[in-house]
UniProtKB/Swiss-Prot annotation:
The UvrABC repair system catalyzes the recognition and processing of DNA lesions. UvrA is an ATPase and a DNA-binding protein. A damage recognition complex composed of 2 UvrA and 2 UvrB subunits scans DNA for abnormalities. When the presence of a lesion has been verified by UvrB, the UvrA molecules dissociate. Belongs to the ABC transporter superfamily. UvrA family. Residues 978-988 have a biased composition (Basic residues). This is UvrABC system protein A. The lineage of its organism: Bacteria, Pseudomonadati, Pseudomonadota, Gammaproteobacteria, Lysobacterales. Gene3D superfamilies: 3.30.190.20, ABC transporter ATPase domain-like, ABC transporter ATPase like domain, P-loop containing nucleotide triphosphate hydrolases. It holds the Pfam family UvrA_inter. Residues 958-972 have a biased composition (Basic and acidic residues).
């Protein structure tokens, strides 16, 4: 009998509290609850892990050793599982060769299509490389004007130097009467002597004729003779019209003009990962690295002597003496601002003097001077040479700061070699197709109709390509291009690509486990995504989704609410069943938010911007941005909204953040193209909080990441017993020798490799999982040793360390961002995406604040429940109220409706986006008819506009200054002033 339920008994993975539940099979199940309540522990670490483990164990022991087998979950019993496929938020491959096309396998089908029905052309002359039969050649000639006279030519010599007397002898011996030499017709006995050192082309005249039906046989014989003599190449030239282009024929797969040929087309010719297809200059990467003048001249507003080019100023005697000699030769002042120097001088300094010899004065070790004349190498060639010749990783890393990337000049960034770039299907080469947005590519293939045998072969391949492109459109990724690099995709995009690939596989009877597929998706596209999930279910699969999105919860066949709290306070089932069951459950927080008993309130009054304190970014043109001018009010909470692919990340992460980090923090990021920026001096610090993991090793934990572990170790080193023994703070680190347990090297666990079974981690039998040796554990603070402290939750630790300000401040900020339940020593690899981002946020909050920080957050609501979002908004509003500027890229309407200012990009994704539709308050955006964000926002805002009374907190600060163009010296001065003022306040 077929099982109708997945039965789980006694699940205790991570924080799950011995739960029993029955989940219906072949249904869409949504698991929801607070961040850290145990959703992923149930969905991924229990259900998926056991489903995958059982399937893998059905394979042979030999096969199992090549597969990663997940750890066996801690539970009593589970039944009714199917083979499991997980689609997680993890970003895709960081391999620069991985693209949207290769991940979805669409590119593999495109390679097959071009190899089987592609028509190669000569890269130089554009002629199709087609092998024609004699019959086809004759038939073509018979279509020409029968009144015109033509001659049939066989090319014997092509562009070769020499007198070629022996060639004429051979032709005469074979009975040929006329030849054409370099375009001139001669009797064979009257050919003038040819110049020895010039290139010549010699063609034998095989026949002269008028194309009529009655000479068909003669023409065929003439063509056969010509092909034999011309090694498969024939030309037919009009005798009556010398200016007419010749008709060229080839019996082999080659260009009739230059004899360029290709071997038989194979799919690997179109692979940029195979040597036969990759561009030889960039090895198929599509980019070339070069030393960028804009990165080398760090401060163009300074002079060469003051440090316009780092390392070539007065502080470096050797390089500066070269500059001084150059200045003498070209008659320029080393103290003149770089931007004011003549173009010729700047060219010579950066790229060298070319053939011009310059007299250089060098200081000798003895203190004397010596003069030598030679060419000047140039700063950029100097860097290139040092980069090429050095064997020191440190030097190479230092020089990498000056390197930028540009599209490979040989292949124009297409990654393929000449041959592959010149194969056409319906007059389009492969590189032209992969740069099309997915929806345009889909339209192309839907309209593709090839004649004859090509059409028959192409139909099956095109069907597969069309289906896969259609699935990408269904999950809201119609704006992506197939050549987009995988490492530039957001977590949500990467997950939806994998989802599209799974639908393309069309499996039945499988259990899919998904982690928040709605991340990064605008409300407009949500419906299509949910349709995709229901289609997966309707195929006959069980779809388990960890999700916070209201629409997804309402659509589910079965909802599971885990809680009531997070961490140690969660791990229980608060409610399960249909949507109605959840709404009626008094224990379900989710139900209370869905029913409207609880909700995130709209602020009663919005902060209004101060027109004198606006950050201006003008002329942004990165990726799909269309000369965008961005205004962000300082001291407010600004939301950047827009459909997926509209240009939000390019504008904020790639342009604004990189620019601000370079100017204010002294970073060296590559900035997306823009024209100018004004008023960056309103800020003294810029902080970017993204969703990347806080650590990729089990040794990284919240205590080490937030910097709390250092004062903790210092505190333990100050305990009287510790001082008596002479212990330093390093004694309490599990990363270095001294205080850690050397049997497990401070891991607390020992890994036992089991080959074809999952690796087993057992507690170290020396320290019993405590990570430290016995002597270190004897040191106690208020009865707790360092291992006990690492096992504490944040809230317990706060009670213990309240009297220690340096530790308490960091613990308080972890509580503020809703992470009171995590353990101080919890491995960073076990934190969810939302938790990792909030640990980062707490780290920034715990730093001393000047009230002039620019915070940039990319979808901070990822992995957060309605209740968590309310707490997060409290933190963001607190930052704003202290005068800081908070810029958030967000799709969540609860965050958007509480913002002071919104910048909405659109109208669509990809090349149909990239413009700012509307900027203003949420009410302004809701009133804008063209804005998709506005349409959804209007449903959440009351009809009466919120009163705009309170000015921005930052506007009243004494630091406020009128707008002006940013200069690095002024940024430094502003920072210094702010620091002094803060110090004065503290003193008073």
């Amino acid at each position: 009998m077929a099982m109708d339920f997945i039965r789980i008994r006694g699940a205790r993975t991570h924080n799950l509290k011995n739960i029993d539940l029955d989940l219906p099979r072949d249904k869409l199940i949504v698991i929801t609850g607070l961040s850290g309540s145990g959703k992923s522990s149930l969905a991924f670490d229990t259900i998926y892990a056991e489903g995958q483990r059982r399937y893998v164990e059905s394979l042979s022991a030999y096969a199992r050793q090549f597969l990663s087998v997940m750890e066996k979950p801690d539970l009593d019993h589970i039944e009714g599982l199917s083979p499991a496929i997980s689609i997680e938020q993890k970003s895709t491959s960081h391999n620069p060769r991985s693209t949207v096309g290769t991940i979805t396998e669409i590119y593999d089908y495109l390679r097959l299509l071009y190899a089987r029905v592609g028509q190669p052309r000569c890269p130089d002359h554009g002629f199709p490389l087609e092998a024609q039969t004699v019959s086809q050649m004759v038939d073509h000639m018979l279509t020409l004007d029968p009144e015109q006279r033509y001659m049939l030519l066989a090319p014997v010599i092509r562009d070769r130097k020499g007198e070629h007397a022996q060639v004429f002898e051979q032709l005469r011996a074979q009975g040929f009467v006329r030849v054409r030499v370099d375009g001139e017709l001669y009797e064979i006995d009257a050919v003038p002597p040819l110049a020895l050192r010039q290139k010549h082309t010699i063609e034998a005249v095989i026949d002269r004729f008028r194309p009529r039906e009655d000479i068909k046989q003669r023409l065929a014989e003439s063509f056969e003779t010509a092909l034999k003599l011309g090694e498969g190449m024939v030309a037919v030239q009009s005798l009556d019209d010398a200016t007419a282009a010749p008709h060229l024929f080839s019996s082999k797969y080659s260009c009739p003009v230059c004899d360029y040929s290709l071997p038989e087309l194979e799919p690997r010719l179109f692979s940029f990962n195979a040597p036969v297809g990759a561009c030889p200059s960039c090895d198929g990467l599509g980019v070339a690295e070069f030393f960028d003048p804009d990165r080398v001249v760090v401060h163009p507003e300074l002079s060469l002597s003051a440090g316009a080019v780092r390392g070539w100023d007065r502080r470096n005697a050797y390089y500066f003496q070269l500059i001084a000699s150059l200045a003498k030769h070209y008659k320029f002042d080393v103290d003149a601002v770089w931007n004011t120097l003549p173009a010729k001088v700047r060219q010579a300094v950066l790229f060298g003097s070319g053939d011009e010899v310059i007299s250089f004065t060098y200081f000798t070790d003895a203190g004397g001077r010596t003069t030598r004349k030679h060419r000047f190498e140039g700063i950029l060639p100097n860097l290139e040479r040092r980069y090429r010749e050095t064997e020191s990783p440190a030097v190479r890393e230092e020089l990498t700061k000056y390197v930028s990337q540009q599209p490979c000049p040989a292949c124009n960034g297409t990654r393929l070699n000449r041959a592959a770039r010149n194969v056409f299907v319906a007059d389009r080469p492969l590189p032209e197709l992969v740069v099309l947005p997915v929806n345009e590519a889909l339209n192309f293939f839907r309209g593709l109709s090839l004649p004859g045998w090509r059409g028959e072969i192409a139909s099956k391949i095109v069907k597969e390509i069309g289906e896969r492109l259609g699935f990408l459109v269904d999950v809201g990724l119609d704006y992506l291009t197939l050549e987009r690099k995988a490492d530039t995709l957001s977590g949500g995009e990467a997950q939806r690509i994998r989802l599209a690939s799974q639908i393309g596989a069309g499996l039945v009877g499988v259990m899919y486990v998904l982690d928040e597929p709605s991340i990064g998706l605008h409300q407009r596209d949500n419906e299509r995504l949910l349709g995709t999930l229901t289609r997966l279910r309707d195929l006959g699969n069980t779809v388990i989704v960890v999700e916070h999105d209201e629409d997804a919860i309402r659509l589910a066949d079965h909802v599971l609410d885990i809680g009531p709290g997070a961490g140690v306070h969660g791990g229980e089932i608060c409610a399960q069943g249909t949507l109605q069951d959840i709404l009626e459950s008094p224990r379900s927080l989710t139900g209370q938010y869905l029913s409207g008993k609880r909700r995130i309130e709209i602020p009663k009054q919005r902060h209004k911007p101060n027109p004198k304190m606006m950050l201006h970014l003008r002329g942004a043109t990165g990726n799909n941005l269309k000369n965008v001018d961005l205004e962000i009010p300082a001291g407010l909470l600004t939301c950047i909204t827009g459909v997926s692919g509209s240009g939000k990340s390019t504008l904020i992460n790639d342009t604004l953040f990189t620019l601000a980090a370079n100017e204010i923090n002294g970073a060296s990021h590559t900035v997306a193209p823009h024209r100018e920026v004004e008023n960056l001096d309103l800020f003294d610090k810029v902080v970017d909080i993204d969703q990347s993991p806080i650590g990729r090793t089990p040794r990284s934990n919240p205590a080490t990441y937030t910097g709390m572990f250092t004062p903790l170790r210092e505190l333990f080193a100050q305990v009287p017993e510790s001082r008596a023994r002479g212990y330093s703070p390093g004694r309490f680190s599990f990363n270095v020798r001294g205080g850690r347990c050397e049997a497990c090297q401070g891991d607390g666990m020992i890994k036992v490799e089991m080959h074809f079974l999952p690796d087993v981690y057992v507690p170290c039998d020396v320290c019993h999982g405590k990570r430290y040796n016995r002597e270190t554990l004897e040191i106690r603070y208020k009865g707790f040793n360092i291992s006990d402290v690492l096992q504490m939750t944040v809230e317990d630790a706060l009670r213990l360390f309240e009297p220690v300000p340096s530790i308490a401040r960091k613990l308080e900020t972890l509580v503020d961002v809703g992470l009171s339940y995590i353990k101080l020593g919890q491995s960073a690899t076990t934190l969810s995406g939302g938790e990792a981002q909030r640990v980062k946020l707490s780290k920034e909050l715990s730093r001393r604040d000047t009230g002039r920080t620019l915070y940039i957050l990319d979808e901070p609501t990822t992995g957060l429940h309605f209740h968590d979002i309310e707490a997060l908004l409290g933190v963001l509003h607190k930052l704003r109220d202290e005068g800081n500027t908070v810029v958030v890229i967000e799709h969540n309407l609860d965050v958007i409706k509480t913002a002071d200012w919104i910048v909405d990009l659109g109208p669509e994704g990809g090349h149909r986006g990239g413009t700012i539709l509307v900027s203003g308050t949420p009410e302004d955006v809701a009133a804008h008819k063209a804005s998709y964000t506005g349409q959804f926002l209007a449903k959440m805002l009351p009809s009466v506009k919120a009163r705009e009374t309170r000015p921005a907190a930052m506007a009243n600060k004494p630091d406020a200054r009128p707008p002006r163009k940013v200069k690095p010296e002024k940024v430094a001065k502003a920072t210094k002033t702010a620091t002094k003022k803060t110090a004065k306040k503290k003193a008073s």
